[in-house]
Amino acid sequence: MKVTYEIENGKKIKVKTYVDGTVFKYDENGNKIYYKDNDGNEDWKEYDSNGKVIHYKNSNGREDWYEYDSNGNKIHSWDNRGYEYWQEHDANGNVIHLKDNDGYEKWYEFDANGHCIHFKDTDGIEWWSEHDANGNKIHFKDINGYERWC
């Protein structure tokens, strides 16, 4: 591996080049901003001031954008293929609601230890689970009547 530095847009960039042709580039904060594999596939990332990815694109034409709340939780994302989704989080950062632009929704409920104890979606899937004091799942039940004690 060879490490070099270059200046891009007035900023110092760390470049790692491997013998097989793979290249990684990192910004001044250590965030990976560029990757190229030995087959020529590439991807690029842009970050906000908190180190969260706000824009991603690759050499295959994919492009994604992300927005975050003040706690750093991803709350909105969309891409150049027309897909878009929104997320809500609880005080612990767990995703409790997800909705996409096709109308599909998911809801999650967590216990005080961060274990998912209830799931429901717009396709009619719903289940519940219980955990012991060590976090091990001890009971599972779904809306169709399936039940398992672990």
List each language-model region with its residue ranges.
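A detector of tandem-repeat and repeat-rich interaction/domain scaffolds
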Residues: 14-150
